[in-house]
């Protein structure tokens, strides 16, 4: 079956640093708890992973923000912990405490028992969702697939859930670096296969979320996080539907490492609000596109203040292509959807002036 032609390719064009008429925008966690319609579907599903595993419902929540807002991309509704879950670690969610694993891995013996999951068997529900979303989108906007980075997945797998001080994962990293590298290798192979399976199923762009890379020292970041993302980028399918499949790397609090990240082979880097976009562009704008970078907490402000922040970020990046507007991290559940609408409308209103010479 031939895929329908893409009606809006603004997002893919910006990632390729090709001319655009306005700055494309999507929001991390755009399908989520801030939307009343999401809460309704989430209630039907029962629990979060049941929602991820239900093709029809995962497709529905992916589409919800696109019906409400004029966005330039859809992102697969899923979770970064699907891979460790498929490895049999017993993922569960505890109210108010986030994800937890019944069987964390903290020794070489436990790590050696891990296998790369079968992408069309244990993770087939993700690929089914990608295919369903592509059908539903019908060429309206591109679909982004994603995964957590090996380091970020490892933090959850070793800690057994969320953590504030990363003591267990850092203990493994320093006390038994060989075990840590063994774990990161199996995760890098898993993520490569996982993203390639998403691309084969129809994802037109992919993103690697390195949520916890920013807790490492520069030396450890390069050895335990970036090296494995580079490995993934090198192993990805880079063309589908007759066009390039761009890859974006995002390390939260990773602004100091943009040069090293830009040398990874990625097409774009996500930037959070702790880095100035003009600074990021001066440093790596010649090599990669940039995505970001409004603090999601600005969405608590009145629409006039949101509009002011959007203008400030557009001015910071400056004129020309190569910028995808986004938040610097996921949208907060308490945000008023009308404030998200004001954010998107402000980008539509003010960004064309920055592209008059594209």
Swiss-Prot record:
Belongs to the uroporphyrinogen decarboxylase family. HAMAP family: URO_D. This is Uroporphyrinogen decarboxylase. Its EC number is 4.1.1.37. It is an enzyme of class 4 (lyase). SUPFAM superfamilies: UROD/MetE-like (SSF51726). It comes from the Bacteria. It is found in: Cytoplasm. InterPro entries: UROD/MetE-like_sf, Uroporphyrinogen_deCO2ase_HemE, Uroporphyrinogen_deCOase. Catalyzes the decarboxylation of four acetate groups of uroporphyrinogen-III to yield coproporphyrinogen-III. Its main location: cytoplasm. It catalyses: uroporphyrinogen III + 4 H(+) = coproporphyrinogen III + 4 CO2. Homodimer. GO terms for cellular component: cytosol. Gene3D superfamilies: 3.20.20.210. Pathway: Porphyrin-containing compound metabolism; protoporphyrin-IX biosynthesis; coproporphyrinogen-III from 5-aminolevulinate: step 4/4. Keywords: Cytoplasm, Decarboxylase, Lyase, Porphyrin biosynthesis. PROSITE patterns: UROD_1, UROD_2. One of its GO terms (molecular function) is uroporphyrinogen decarboxylase activity. The record marks 79 as: Transition state stabilizer. Substrate binds at residues 29-33, 79, 156, 211, 329. Pfam families: URO-D. GO terms for biological process: protoporphyrinogen IX biosynthetic process from glutamate.
């Amino acid at each position: 079956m031939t895929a329908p032609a893409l009606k809006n390719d603004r997002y893919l064009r910006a990632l390729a640093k090709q001319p655009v008429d306005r700055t494309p925008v999507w929001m991390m966690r755009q399908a989520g708890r801030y939307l009343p319609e999401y809460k309704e579907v989430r209630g039907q599903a029962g629990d979060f992973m049941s929602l991820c595993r239900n093709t029809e419902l995962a497709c529905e929540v992916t589409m919800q923000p696109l019906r409400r807002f004029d966005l330039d991309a859809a992102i697969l509704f899923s979770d970064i912990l699907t891979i460790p879950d498929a490895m049999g670690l017993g993922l569960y969610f505890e109210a108010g405490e986030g994800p937890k694993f019944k069987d964390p891995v903290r020794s070489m013996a436990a790590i050696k028992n891990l296998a790369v999951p079968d992408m069309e068997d244990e993770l087939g529900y993700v690929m089914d969702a990608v295919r369903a979303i592509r059908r539903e989108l019908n060429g309206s906007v591109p679909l982004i697939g994603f995964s957590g980075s090996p380091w970020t997945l490892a933090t959850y797998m070793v800690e057994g859930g969320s953590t504030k001080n990363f003591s267990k994962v850092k203990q493994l990293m320093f006390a038994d670096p060989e075990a840590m590298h063994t774990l990161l290798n199996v995760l890098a192979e898993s993520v490569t296969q996982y993203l390639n399976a998403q691309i084969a199923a129809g994802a037109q762009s992919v993103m690697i979320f390195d949520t916890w890379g920013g807790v490492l020292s520069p030396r450890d970041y390069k050895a335990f996080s970036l090296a494995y993302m580079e490995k993934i980028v090198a192993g990805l399918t880079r063309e589908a539907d007759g066009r390039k499949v761009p890859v974006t790397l995002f390390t939260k609090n990773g602004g100091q490492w943009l040069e090293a990240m830009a040398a990874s082979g990625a097409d774009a880097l996500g930037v959070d609000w702790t880095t100035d976009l003009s600074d990021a562009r001066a440093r790596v704008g010649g090599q990669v596109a940039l995505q970001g970078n409004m603090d999601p907490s600005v969405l608590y402000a009145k629409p006039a203040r949101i509009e002011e922040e959007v203008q400030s970020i557009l001015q910071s990046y400056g004129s020309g292509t190569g910028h995808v507007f986004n938040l610097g991290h996921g949208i907060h559940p308490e945000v008023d959807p009308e404030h998200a609408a004001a954010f998107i409308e402000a980008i539509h209103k003010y960004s064309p002036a920055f592209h008059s010479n594209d």
